[in-house]
A protein has these predicted regions:
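Bacterial N-terminal signal peptides that target proteins for export
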Residues: 1-9
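N-terminal glycine/threonine-rich, aromatic-flanked beta-hairpin/loop signature
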Residues: 59-106, 113-117, 144, 155
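Amphipathic hydrophobic-ligand
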Residues: 62, 91, 124-132, 165-171
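Hydrophobic/aromatic beta-strand elements that line small-molecule binding cavities or substrate pockets
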Residues: 67-72, 95-100, 128-143, 149-151, ...
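Tryptophan-anchored aromatic micro-motifs
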Residues: 37-59, 95-97
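Bacterial N-terminal signal peptides
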Residues: 10-19
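Boundary at the C-terminal end of the N-terminal hydrophobic targeting segment
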Residues: 20-25, 31-33
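Edge beta-strand at a domain terminus
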Residues: 29-30, 151-176
Length: 176
């Protein structure tokens, strides 16, 4: 009889422990980092990017906002394309990067895009090289978010000498 009680208690304890470990691993779908768990950020977003003055956060005078599409894929990869009229046709390629969850409704992402050739038309803004965006994202609902962060331009293959760089504030709306 004692053996049956001990065996029953052991099975009950192992069953409870198994469910507890599974519950902790799932964490209600709130996995962090570049995990495989689904995240509300996944999907394609219509994004409005506004260049801002880094020190004050005010819009850069005379610089219009840019419309972009950002796609956040499962596993932490992303792609981007935009309509920035400051680039000449074919001058900037699509952006590729990564994203990760940093909090319950917070994320960060980084992407880079090649600048294929120096600007040929005045005001000769961009040199051949690449553009990098580093942004922090705060989701407000499952269908909208805001972000802010750095936008850097690097000439050639340099990683230490950014050409005209700045900051940007963005709003994202899920594409339906």
């Amino acid at each position: 009889m004692n053996t049956k009680k001990t065996l029953l208690a052991t099975v009950a304890a192992l069953t409870f422990a198994g469910y507890s470990v599974a519950g902790m691993a799932n964490d209600g779908g709130l996995a962090f980092g570049r995990s495989q768990a689904p995240a509300p950020l996944e999907g394609t977003w219509v994004v409005t990017i506004q260049p801002i003055v880094c020190s004050s956060g005010i819009d850069v005078p005379g610089v219009p906002s840019v419309r972009a599409y950002l796609t956040f894929a499962p596993g932490g990869t992303m792609t981007e394309t935009n309509s920035n009229m400051a680039f000449e046709p074919g001058q900037r390629g699509p952006g590729h990067g990564y994203w990760e969850r940093t909090g319950r409704t917070s994320y960060q992402f980084a992407l880079e895009a090649f600048i294929q050739f120096d600007s040929k038309l005045a005001p000769f803004r961009y040199k051949r090289g690449y553009q990098r965006l580093d942004q922090t994202v705060e989701m407000h609902t499952t269908d909208d978010w805001t972000s802010s962060g750095r936008v850097q331009f690097f000439a050639g293959t340099s990683t230490t000498d950014p050409s005209p760089s700045g900051c940007a504030r963005s709003t994202g709306a899920r594409m339906f």
